[in-house]
Structures are given as structure tokens and as C-alpha cells.
Amino acid sequence: MENVQSRMQGSRIPGLKEMNPSGTNARSRLPQPGAIANKPTAVPQLARTRSTTESTRIGAGPPSAARSVNGATKAHTRANSYANSSTLTRSASAASRPRGPLSSSTSGRPKTSMSTSRRPNGHALPRPATSLDTHQEERSYGGLGKRGEWDQDEREQNLESLFETFVSRISQQGQESSGLKDALEVYKSRVGELEEAKSEQTEQNIRLKVELDVSKSRLAEAEDALKNAQRDHEIAIDELMSRQRAECESVRYESQKSLDALKAQHESELKELRRQFERELEDEKCARVRELNQLHSKTALDAQLSQIELDKTIKELAATREDLQSLRTELDRERKNTNNLRQNLDTAASNSVTLESTISALKARIEFLESGREEQSEAFERLNQQMMDAMAETNAAKEKLRREETLRRKLHNQVQELKGNIRVFCRVRPTLENEGASDAAQFTYPDEGEDSKEINIIGPEEKSSFGTVTRKNHNFSFDHVFGPSAQNSDVFDEISQLVQSALDGYNVCIFCYGQTGSGKTHTMSSLDGMIPRAVHQIYETATSLEEKGWRYTMEGNFVEVYNENLNDLLGKAEELDKKKLEIRHDMQRGKTTITDATTVQLESPEMVESLLKRAAANRSVAATKANERSSRSHSIFILKLIGENYITGERSEGTLNLVDLAGSERLSHSGATGDRLKETQNINRSLSCLGDVIAALGQGKKDGHIPYRNSKLTYLLQFSLGGNSKTLMFVMVSPLQAHLSETLTSLKFATKVHNTHIGTAKKQTRVRDV
């Protein structure tokens, strides 16, 4: 009795586990639930999952709380019958195991055909809402069971009611078993096929597993070897790095020590040599200037005398030519008369008898005319000799003029060399209308009325820690200083001699350097700037040299360096950044060409004005905090001058480069961001490269490296910055106090350039074979 009660208390529904469905249901010989599903299968996992899901969906059924509590029969389809039968079989099989003494005599089928049991009527407890309340429900049912242990009749009554319920449901399931048999046969055949596929899949899985194990072992060995090699490599690298650091430190210490000693010795020697050289140079300059002044005055006087003699000779030659022409006309007339007389003489010969007197007269006349012709011939020969002498004198005068022109070019080049092959001019722009006078810094020009070579800048007031207010003076000296009142015409008067050197066959480079907004573009590219004035002077000089046998052809290019890329400013606007221009150098001839760049034949100065307008429209400009129209690129106007003297066969090739550099600026002042930031960085980088090139040229080393290739700007101007050229730098400064720091930086760089000597320029001429 106690055993039965304990079994009833362990079951959720009293009396369920004590019933044996195999003893009650005659059709309980079906396989154990899950036997088919648990068999090995060779089909893919997807099909197996689908089958399992479908079986679960069919056999799960709604929860028992949703079923009828009075045990009413519910209709099923064929698929539902099969699923319910399978679930019932599993429940019956699970309940058929021995549970105690009561299980041998009492048995029963599950209450429903689904996998979940129906709740019993009467005193059966309701199923919990969730599976988490199982223990609580069992505790509640255990309490009822304990109360039922003292009432044997009540227990028997419960068992009988349960038995009657099971019997009714078993009879209901018997009607559904026929459909389940047919489904079972179908599934048995399917199970056979699946078992065969499973065996094949199992063999394949075993083979793949063996291969995977082999691969894993090889991979593990390779990883171990790699880790060992990496560890050895890291150890070796650490040793090498430590050894190298030690060696570098020792070498650096020794080098610094020797360098300091050499530097001190070199500075002392350099100071002494510089003092001696400056003294000698000053003496030599004075002597050369005196000689040049004498030569200039003598040359000018000789040229004047030669010109006067030449004019006189030309006038005499013209008069002689006129006399000769009149004599020739008279001689022709006399010859015609003679011919007429001879004809008359022939006619009169037939009438000799009657015309003897006439013949005598005619003979006398003929003799007279013949004697006059001899005198005329002698006069003609005398005039012809005078003309030949005059032409010889004219040729001698022209040859003397050509020699004087050659001497002038030589003396002109010597003067330019004495002034320095690299010269620096400083120009201070005037204040604009929107800039007040109070905003200007204090500039003074100590020698403004004399040589105009010095500029003095008074810095702002600075208060020391002791309370003393001081001002710092900054003194600079250049080849020429132009104040705010200077015009472009005054500036061009100083550089016109360099333009003449380009006509003589030298490479000349004139470039403007300075911060943004300091007036570089106005100085170079305005309508009265250096570029138009230089072209006008070249045309005027070339025209005057035509009578000395020179013929010049001129061609120009206009390009810009924008973000280290070359753009053709004379090309089409839509192709500005699409054409790829390349720089080609002919090292033997010292010539530079730009591929695919537009080359324009300059036939008149007016063409230059149209070219400047087109280039200004294509040039890259943008607004910054420092300048509302700031040039964002370096523009280079390249003018090639090819001259040929058809008398002497001499040929000259010169190049004039007029460069308008983009404004140097500090990022903190310009406030550039985005594209403007990139432009500013490229501008400052190229200007720094220009300074490096000039510094390297100033060292004067014969085989020293000159970093032309560090920037497109310096690479393009390679032959115009080297020793075979004449270079002029304009440093443009702003007069405003707010720009004082940038002004001082520009002037210091200009001083560095001014102290640089780049060698002697070479004339590019050759004599044509005549």
C-alpha cells in the first residue's frame, strides 16, 4: 500500500504510470517511439531537420489545458492520426516499464492520441501554466495524496474513473490505427533509403575527418616552426639594433667633436678671408668702374664720330650716284644721235657728188663728237672709282659698327658681372585705400637720395622684465631698394639691362618673392608691369639691330606650377588640368622644353597683352584670410629669343624667364583649410626648395649636388638659376604692421640670396657656316 501511494505521488496525474498500454491496447506492437527518428541516416542534415520539424509540428498538438475536460471525442485527419498514434506508442512504451507491484496488474493507454496527455475529469489537478511550476504542482498534488491515503474508497473510485476514461479513449484510438499502418509502411521504405545514404555519408565523414586531423597536425607543426623562427628573428633584430645604437652614438659623438673643431677653425679662416676679399673686391670695383667710365666715354665719342663720318659719306655717295645717273642718260642720248647720223651718212653716201660739202661738215661733226665721248668715258670711270671708294668706306664703317656692337655687348656683360650674376631688389608696396596710415609699420630709407640700397625697419615696442620699453631696429642692404612711391617704370629702368642680356644670348631669370598680398602680380603681370615692358624693349632693340645685320624671332610659353603639377595657361580652360606637361632638359645645349605646352610666336607687343589676359583668366586664385585674391600657383612666362646675323653668320639664343611666385604665408595667419591648406603646403614646400637650390649654388662646389629635382619650379628653372645665367630676385614686402613678422622673414631670405654667388654667366652663341 505504501509503495502504491509513493508511485501515485510521483506522477502528475494519479494512476497514469501504473497503467500498461501494452496490456490494454491490442495494437501496441508498434515500434518504440523515436526508434525510426533515432536510426542513423545518410541524408543531409537539412532534410533531417525538415523532417524533424514537421514531425514535431504534427505531433506536438495544443497543450492539454486547451482540450475538452469531459473526454469528448475529437476528429483527426490521416496525418494527425499517425502522429497521435506515434506519440501514444511512445507514452505506452515509457509506461510499460516495471514501476512496482501495482504496474503488473493495472495498465492503460495514454489519455490522448497526441504526445501530451489529457487532464482527467473529476478531482484531477489542473496543469501548471508553465513548465517552471512543475515542482510547485507536485508539491500541491502531494498534499492531496496524503489526504487520500486515509480514504481507500476514494482512491478506488478515482482509479475506476480513470480506467473508464482510458478505455473510452483506447477504443477511439483503435479506429485510427488503420491509417497509421499505411503511413508506417511508407516511412519504413523511406527509412531504408535513408539508412543507406547515412552509411555512405558516414564513410565520407570518416575519410574527411582523417584528412582534417592530418591537416591540423601539419598546421600545428608549421605554426610552431613559424613561432620559433619569429622568436629567433626578434632576438637577432634586438641584438643588431642595440649594437647599431651603440655604434651610432659613438660615431655621432666623435663626428660632433671633430665637426665643432673644424667649424671653429673654418669660421676664423673664413672671417679673415672675407675681410681680405672685401678689401680687394672694393679696390678692384673702383678700378674697374673708372676704366669702364673711360671706355664708355671713349666708345660713345668714337661711335659719334663714326656716325658723323658715315652720314657724310652716305650723302656724298648719294650725290655721286645722281651725277653718274645723269651722265649715263646724256651718254645714251649722244649714242642715239650718233646712230642717227650714221644712218644719214649712209643715205648721203649714195648722193656723194651732191653732198660732199655736207659730208665734210658731218665728218667734222663726227670727229668732234668722238673726242667728247672719250672725255665722257674718262669722267664716268673717275666717278665709278669715287663710288667704289665711298662703298669701301661705308663697308669699313659698318664693320667698325659691328665691332663696336660686339665690344658693347662684352662691356655690358662685364658691367652685369660686376654687379653680380644674382642680384636682389627690394620693393615696398604703398598702403591701399582701405588700409589706414596707423596700420603701417615704420620704414626708413637711409640712402634714398643716393644709391637707394638700404632699408631700415623699426620694430614694435617691447617691454623688458625691468620695465624698459625698447624698439628693435632691423637693417637690410640690397642692390636696390624701391620705396612705396616708386612706379613700375622706375623699377623697369633698373632691370632693362638684364633684358638686354637676354637679347645678347644669355639666360635671364627675374622672379618676385614675398608674402601674399605684397604686390608681386602687379609688378610682373599688370599692363605696365615687367613682362609687357620687357617685351616692348626687346622689340625696339631688335628693330634697331636690323640695320646691323641681326634678325630676331621670339616665341613664348606661359605655364603655372599648381600643387606640383604643370598647367598650360595659354591652352583651353577646359583642358587646364587634363593635359600632362613634362619638362625635358638638353644637357649639352643647356635648353629646356615643355612637352605639349602651347608655344606662341610673338610678332608684336600687342600680342603679349592678349596673352597676359588669357593667362590671368586661367591662373589659379582663391580668397584667404590674408588676401581676398591670392595667387595659389607659381606662374612662369618663358620668352625665347633667337637672333641671327646674316652678315657675320653669328647666332645667339637667349631665354628670359619672368616668374611670379605664389605668396608665402603661415598657416596660422592665412587660416587655410581643405584645398587651401594643400595649396599652402605645396607653395611653402616649393619656396623652401628654391631656397635650398640657391644655398647649394652659393657653396660654389664644382661637383656639389644641386637639389633641382625636389620641386617642379626649380627643375623647370634649372638652366636659369645655375652658373650660366643672370638672376634677379624681387623681394616684395607689405608696409603693414600686422605683416611685420612675414616681412622680416622675406627680407632675411633675400639677404641670404644676396650673399650668394652663382658663378659667371655663359653666352649661348655660335657662328654659322657661311
UniProtKB/Swiss-Prot annotation:
<protein>
    <recommendedName>
        <fullName>Kinesin-like protein klpA</fullName>
    </recommendedName>
</protein>
<feature type="compositionally biased region" description="Basic and acidic residues">
    <location>
        <begin position="134"/>
        <end position="152"/>
    </location>
</feature>
<dbReference type="InterPro" id="IPR027417">
    <property type="entry name" value="P-loop_NTPase"/>
</dbReference>
<dbReference type="GO" id="GO:0055028">
    <property type="term" value="C:cortical microtubule"/>
</dbReference>
<keyword id="KW-0067">ATP-binding</keyword>
<dbReference type="GO" id="GO:0005871">
    <property type="term" value="C:kinesin complex"/>
</dbReference>
<feature type="region of interest" description="Disordered">
    <location>
        <begin position="1"/>
        <end position="152"/>
    </location>
</feature>
<dbReference type="InterPro" id="IPR027640">
    <property type="entry name" value="Kinesin-like_fam"/>
</dbReference>
<feature type="domain" description="Kinesin motor">
    <location>
        <begin position="421"/>
        <end position="756"/>
    </location>
</feature>
<dbReference type="GO" id="GO:0008569">
    <property type="term" value="F:minus-end-directed microtubule motor activity"/>
</dbReference>
<feature type="compositionally biased region" description="Low complexity">
    <location>
        <begin position="85"/>
        <end position="105"/>
    </location>
</feature>
<dbReference type="GO" id="GO:0000743">
    <property type="term" value="P:nuclear migration involved in conjugation with cellular fusion"/>
</dbReference>
<dbReference type="GO" id="GO:0090561">
    <property type="term" value="P:nuclear migration during mitotic telophase"/>
</dbReference>
<dbReference type="GO" id="GO:0003777">
    <property type="term" value="F:microtubule motor activity"/>
</dbReference>
<dbReference type="GO" id="GO:0000742">
    <property type="term" value="P:karyogamy involved in conjugation with cellular fusion"/>
</dbReference>
<dbReference type="GO" id="GO:0090307">
    <property type="term" value="P:mitotic spindle assembly"/>
</dbReference>
<dbReference type="GO" id="GO:0005634">
    <property type="term" value="C:nucleus"/>
</dbReference>
<dbReference type="GO" id="GO:0008017">
    <property type="term" value="F:microtubule binding"/>
</dbReference>
<keyword id="KW-0505">Motor protein</keyword>
<feature type="binding site">
    <location>
        <begin position="514"/>
        <end position="521"/>
    </location>
    <ligand>
        <name>ATP</name>
    </ligand>
</feature>
<dbReference type="GO" id="GO:0072686">
    <property type="term" value="C:mitotic spindle"/>
</dbReference>
<dbReference type="GO" id="GO:0007018">
    <property type="term" value="P:microtubule-based movement"/>
</dbReference>
<dbReference type="GO" id="GO:0030951">
    <property type="term" value="P:establishment or maintenance of microtubule cytoskeleton polarity"/>
</dbReference>
<dbReference type="GO" id="GO:0031122">
    <property type="term" value="P:cytoplasmic microtubule organization"/>
</dbReference>
<dbReference type="Pfam" id="PF00225">
    <property type="entry name" value="Kinesin"/>
</dbReference>
<keyword id="KW-0206">Cytoskeleton</keyword>
<keyword id="KW-0547">Nucleotide-binding</keyword>
<dbReference type="GO" id="GO:0005815">
    <property type="term" value="C:microtubule organizing center"/>
</dbReference>
<dbReference type="GO" id="GO:0005874">
    <property type="term" value="C:microtubule"/>
</dbReference>
<dbReference type="GO" id="GO:1990942">
    <property type="term" value="P:mitotic metaphase chromosome recapture"/>
</dbReference>
<comment type="similarity">
    <text>Belongs to the TRAFAC class myosin-kinesin ATPase superfamily. Kinesin family. NCD subfamily.</text>
</comment>
<dbReference type="GO" id="GO:1990537">
    <property type="term" value="C:mitotic spindle polar microtubule"/>
</dbReference>
<dbReference type="GO" id="GO:0001578">
    <property type="term" value="P:microtubule bundle formation"/>
</dbReference>
<dbReference type="GO" id="GO:0031534">
    <property type="term" value="P:minus-end directed microtubule sliding"/>
</dbReference>
<feature type="coiled-coil region">
    <location>
        <begin position="175"/>
        <end position="425"/>
    </location>
</feature>
<dbReference type="InterPro" id="IPR001752">
    <property type="entry name" value="Kinesin_motor_dom"/>
</dbReference>
<dbReference type="InterPro" id="IPR036961">
    <property type="entry name" value="Kinesin_motor_dom_sf"/>
</dbReference>
<dbReference type="GO" id="GO:0035371">
    <property type="term" value="C:microtubule plus-end"/>
</dbReference>
<dbReference type="GO" id="GO:0051256">
    <property type="term" value="P:mitotic spindle midzone assembly"/>
</dbReference>
<dbReference type="GO" id="GO:1990810">
    <property type="term" value="P:microtubule anchoring at mitotic spindle pole body"/>
</dbReference>
<dbReference type="GO" id="GO:0000235">
    <property type="term" value="C:astral microtubule"/>
</dbReference>
<dbReference type="GO" id="GO:0090619">
    <property type="term" value="C:meiotic spindle pole"/>
</dbReference>
